[in-house]
Swiss-Prot record:
This is Phosphatidylserine lipase ABHD16A. GO terms for cellular component: membrane. Keywords: Hydrolase, Lipid metabolism, Membrane, Transmembrane, Transmembrane helix. It comes from Bos taurus. The gene is ABHD16A. Its EC number is 3.1.-.-, 3.1.1.23. GO terms for molecular function: monoacylglycerol lipase activity; phospholipase activity.
Length: 558
């Protein structure tokens, strides 16, 4: 009877993975058939085959879930319509509640029938036995057996806790349950006294900004967190998950962040290979509709690196909602997991981000200054210009205030706090992070990210002449035109390197540098072009084109 109840309340099972020969071992869970511990020895297909009763019940419950999601998103309009028609009176609501209660009882009955279907299936019974054993005892053998199954991630046991590192338990400088530290935006109106009256005057605007951010704004910024999109992508995500586990020998793990969100991760270990880059770990930060199952992790994987992918809060197996604070909290526990559980030193970790993932990557670079390098692909300096691009001009004040208070993705500001090597990859036909049209390459916000970065590190070089010539170089529409500008100013790379190395030897590596202070205008132009060319690579593609492995290069450093 207890097993039947477990089948009724248990998670949905999607797939049973093929085990590698090296991982086959006798089961430590009593009553485990050999056909489950060694899937190759059975006739079962690796995709879980539910019995008819479970299959049809699952379809009904999935349909109900979709209808509930549609009802949730359309509820404001529905309530407004019902109110206008007078259907929200007590005489109308009571019968409706009876109908709703009856429907819930019917769905509960369907869930019980699904449980009976699972109970009659030896595959599911064995899975639930292993899952319960793993929750009771987190032994390596139980976890190894559980990793052979792909199921609803909400039931996966937590593998790593944000407080697990001993240094955090002893130190007060780490994150609290309120979250890790973020850079806060400056007040919109400097010098204004923050009196009680002023706060009352601002209250309507603040309430409006909050409502916009938590309804329309967050879903526009992170469409991957919308349930209906995830439901549509589920087959693709399951296929990507299977590829990472079966072909790349990936290991899935659940991390618990300081805000209570559970973060879904996938680790592919290449340290046992002969390739030297396998000793380096690339932590991948996905875009606003990207998932590690089908995202940018494929690029460093093809290049031979060890890779750690993770999903934003609210994406696929990760819980929560993707606001900046939650994003940073998630990134923090991912980095801690890489260092304290996977055993990588910060000097062996590379941050690779695509698009909006630049926020979490630059936050981690700022917060963990010993990290080896940062690679930002198709990223931007600040969210405000991109948000203004897609909203009406009359909403400018509301959009700016909402972004600054609730969705402040200040990539450039965070990147300037990092001292290590950085490479920016600019998509020359990017249709997402341009503020006009893709053909107008100067409206690409990757340009602004580069300029702010160079102006922070080399303020004397990037003054007037240097800034002007770098803008000309960024405006070039082809590699030939870039080379023409580079040769027009007769950039001597050996001279540039000697100037930078001599300055570093005399003053140390800490940025910003005052190099170029006593230099001629021509010297500053040469140095500015040299530095821009070393920190930015062009990729002839649109925003969503996967980056080829040959374009995944380590950043330049002295």
């Amino acid at each position: 009877m207890a097993k039947l109840l477990s089948c009724v309340l248990g998670p949905r099972l999607y797939k049973i993975y093929r085990e590698r020969d090296s991982e086959r071992a006798p089961s430590s869970v009593p009553g485990t058939p050999t056909s489950v511990t060694n899937p190759h020895s059975s006739s079962w297909d690796t995709y879980y085959q539910p019995r008819a009763l479970e299959k049809h019940a699952d379809s009904i419950l999935a349909l109900a879930s979709v209808f509930w999601s549609i009802s949730y998103y359309s509820s404001p309009f529905a309530f407004f319509y019902l109110y206008r028609k007078g259907y929200l009176s007590l005489s109308k609501v009571v019968p409706f509640s009876h109908y709703a209660g009856t429907l819930l009882l019917l769905l509960a009955g369907v869930a019980c029938l699904r449980g009976i279907g699972r109970w009659t299936n030896p595959q599911y019974r064995q899975f639930i036995t292993i899952l319960e054993a793993t929750h009771r005892n987190h032994s390596a053998e139980n976890k190894r057996q559980l990793a052979n199954y792909n199921f609803d991630f909400r039931s996966w046991p937590v593998d790593f806790h944000w407080e697990e590192p001993s240094s955090r338990k002893e130190s007060r400088g780490g994150p609290s349950r309120r979250g890790v530290a973020l850079l806060r935006p400056e007040p919109l109106h400097r010098g204004t006294a923050d009196t009680f009256l002023n706060r009352v005057k601002k209250l309507p605007c603040q309430i409006t900004s909050y409502l916009v951010a938590h309804t329309l704004g967050r879903r526009m910024l992170y469409p991957g967190s919308v349930y209906l999109l995830q439901k549509a992508l589920m087959p693709v995500l399951l296929q990507g998950q299977a590829r990472l586990v079966e072909e790349c020998h990936g290991r899935r793990a659940k991390l618990l962040a300081c805000d209570g969100n559970e973060i879904d991760t996938m680790f592919v270990d290449r340290r046992g290979t002969a390739e030297p880059q396998g000793q380096k770990l690339v932590i991948c930060c996905e875009g606003n509709a990207g998932f590690y199952e089908v995202g940018c992790v494929s690029t460093p994987l093809e290049a031979g690196y060890s890779v750690l992918g993770w999903n934003h809060p609210g994406f696929a197996g990760s819980t929560g909602v993707p606001f900046p604070q939650n994003e940073a909290n998630a990134m923090d526990v991912v980095v801690q997991f890489a260092i304290h559980r996977l055993g990588f030193q910060p000097e062996d970790i590379i941050l690779y981000a695509w698009s909006i993932g630049g926020f979490t990557a630059t936050w981690a670079a700022m917060s963990y200054p010993d990290i080896s390098a940062v690679i930002l692909d198709a990223s931007f300096d600040d969210l405000v210009p991109l948000a203004l691009k897609v909203m009406p001009d009359s909403w400018r004040g509301l959009v700016t205030r909402t972004v600054r208070q609730h969705l402040n993705l200040n990539n450039a500001e965070q990147l300037c706090r990092y001292q290590g090597p950085v490479l920016l990859i600019r998509r020359t036909r990017d249709e997402i992070i341009t503020t006009t049209v893709p053909e107008d390459i100067m409206s690409n916000r990757g340009n602004d990210l580069l300029l702010k970065f160079l102006q922070h590190r080399y303020p004397r070089v990037m003054a007037e002449e240097g800034l002007r010539v770098v803008r000309q170089w960024l405006e070039a529409s082809s590699q030939l035109e870039e080379a023409s500008i580079y040769s027009r100013w007769e950039v001597e790379e050996d001279w540039c390197l000697s100037v930078l190395r001599s300055y570093q030897a005399e003053h140390g590596p800490e940025f910003p540098w005052s190099v170029g202070e006593d230099m001629s205008a021509d010297g500053r132009r040469q140095l500015a072009l040299f530095l821009a060319q070393k920190h930015l690579n062009n990729f002839e593609a649109t925003h969503c084109t996967p980056l080829p492995a040959q374009n995944f290069q380590m950043p330049w450093h002295l």
